[in-house]
């Protein structure tokens, strides 16, 4: 498989579906924001995308809703509609069409180059009522030991 690297700016995102169709690997370098904590660290981790042949609940996807690129987890699919939510978010979702999903994250890449497959987040999604406290502990722990 050939490597095709794409930066996560809006101008280059239009290339993602074409690169994936050509069988290339698309890596979004150092994603911004903290909405996917603790699984993807903004400004630190990169993600590798694959073609979105079948999107399912639990997948982490790159979507463009209303011209805005988002890397979040799928929490619901209803027909052709998909609902996303960041793992680090306590509330708020994004809704759009499945056709707006450009790619599925199949690897999370740390700065050391270590790759790991994203989990389905099933347990994390069920912890939504206590996620606020878990994220607070995570952030404090990270400040002390990072």
Where are the language model's segments positioned?
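Extended hydrophobic leader/signal-anchor segments used for secretion and membrane insertion
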Residues: 1-146
């Amino acid at each position: 498989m050939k490597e095709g690297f794409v930066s996560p700016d809006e101008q280059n995102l239009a290339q993602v579906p074409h690169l994936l169709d050509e069988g290339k690997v698309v890596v979004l370098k150092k994603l911004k924001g903290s909405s996917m904590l603790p699984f993807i660290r903004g400004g630190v981790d990169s993600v590798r995308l694959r073609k979105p042949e079948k999107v399912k609940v639990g997948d982490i996807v790159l979507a463009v809703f209303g011209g805005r690129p988002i890397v979040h987890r799928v929490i619901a699919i209803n027909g052709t509609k998909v609902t996303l939510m960041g793992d680090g978010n306590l509330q708020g979702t994004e809704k759009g069409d499945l056709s707006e999903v450009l790619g599925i994250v199949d690897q999370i890449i740390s700065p050391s180059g270590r790759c790991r497959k994203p989990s389905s987040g099933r347990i994390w999604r069920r912890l939504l009522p206590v996620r606020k406290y878990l994220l607070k502990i995570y952030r404090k722990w990270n400040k002390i030991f990072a």
